[in-house]
């Protein structure tokens, strides 16, 4: 199994600079409850519905990235990521159907504030910045989910038997997903080496950290659904 190099290159550096926020993201109570199988079903349903809307905007972000890259190999790599998301959507729809959520129902849902904040931030970075800025904004989701999936699969406290969320956990620790993440990190590093400038680290760190915080807020959105039901 190819394990992405989470601690290396520009990604590893930005991840370290965002260490406190990164930990709040990858070890969020939503993630911990996925691991234990104790997450409230309505919290997961809220997450799934909003994730469907999120993925549509994420595909648009990759389409924008293609237009900003310099070489055909780079453009092909970004296009492959976009196609992976577009091809993932029918699988996502099928998975949601198992939870009693239809695609028309998801498509008709308004975007939650957390979804709006996150997706529009990434798209704004893409429109106002260059390919490197946009790649950095995309990485907390792309690589973060792999780190979460692998971490949960390897953690002895994670419950996989009789856990309704086991297939979600396995999906993000799957070899196919990890290969895609490794390719995304390689593209990030290639673009960084083309534009390498220490003067940009502060700005790139701010983008990465902001996207990381928005990821944690996306988890919290799901947990808030359970709290709203109890209220």
Question: Where are these predicted regions, by residue range?
Answer:
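Active-site-proximal alpha-helical scaffolds that flank and shape metal-associated catalytic sites
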Residues: 2, 73-179, 209, 213
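Acidic, carboxylate-rich catalytic segments that either coordinate divalent cations
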Residues: 202-231
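Alpha-helical bundle segments that constitute or directly flank the non-heme di-iron/ferroxidase center
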Residues: 19-24, 38-68, 87, 136-146, ...
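A non-catalytic, amphipathic alpha-helix used as a structural packing/dimerization or gating element
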Residues: 46-57, 80, 203-210, 214
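Short alpha-helical hairpin
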Residues: 2, 15-39, 58, 185-194
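Secondary-structure edge/capping motif, primarily at the C-terminal ends of alpha-helices
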Residues: 65-69, 126-129, 152-156, 191, ...
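Long amphipathic all-alpha helical oligomerization modules
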Residues: 174-208
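Basic/polar N-terminal segments that are highly enriched at the extreme N-terminus
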Residues: 1-12, 16, 227-231
